[in-house]
Amino acid sequence: MLRDCYSACRGALQNGGIEAPDFEALCLLEHVTGYGRSGLIAHGDAPVPEEQQALLRELTQKRLTHYPLQYLLGEWSFMGFPLSVGEGVLIPRDDTEVCTDLCLEHLKGKPNAAAIDLCSGSGAIAVALAKLTDCHMTAVELCEKAFYFLETNIELNQAAVTPIKSDVMSCFLDFEDDIFDLIVSNPPYIKSADLPTLQKEVQFEPSLALDGGESGFDFYEAILCNWTQKLRHGGAMVFELGENQAAYVAALMRNQGFENIRTELDFGGTERAIIGIRQ
């Protein structure tokens, strides 16, 4: 029965130390059977075909290895938009909504603004901005696997985003100066030495999307050095931040002539995003 399958999955996840076994069991059950929470309540006695039971057991066992739930499901939501995800692309996180909200705030009242998302990954930020504003959105991603998901998610959401497969460290040369109203990036910002200490689930995500170099600031420094002149005067630079990175990134931005620099906190109280205006 459906109820028994859910209970078995939840129990296995709970015993395996998975943090939110109730929620994850529901996610896996819905993925396999099509029944979510309301379906479980209304149809708890419904029979479950053996092949679905076998698949649910298989996915549960894989999750117990700390393989990410999002990769098992193959899809995750960001700001209400479905995104295809899998091995080779960073999983969209709620924290990134803080960064995206700063972008939306800046773009408000600026029709037909030009914006670019650097280190775009799955395209979470780019897709959300393209769907929620009328900006002309460009997204840059180097990794082949991540670029596949970027293109897939643009199509999935019918988002007006131009994807470019290139390296943000060099492709600034392909753009004229003073053309963007917004440059946003959720760059790799973990110190190289800290990568092995990250939670087990994160170990399955691509290191290229996480590794910010010895200091964790390699991409902030490079983007500010090479991309600032691509912003129009009055344009905004927005970054997602790691823990304890706000002060240094703010100093970098001031050195590049940015003003009105401010940070925003995530739900945990961490300074998670920063914005500055080019004067």
PLM ranges: what are they?
Residues 243-256:
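Short alpha-helix
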Residues 1-33, 37-41, 48:
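Non-catalytic accessory regions of SAM-dependent methyltransferases
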Residues 30-105:
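Conserved AdoMet
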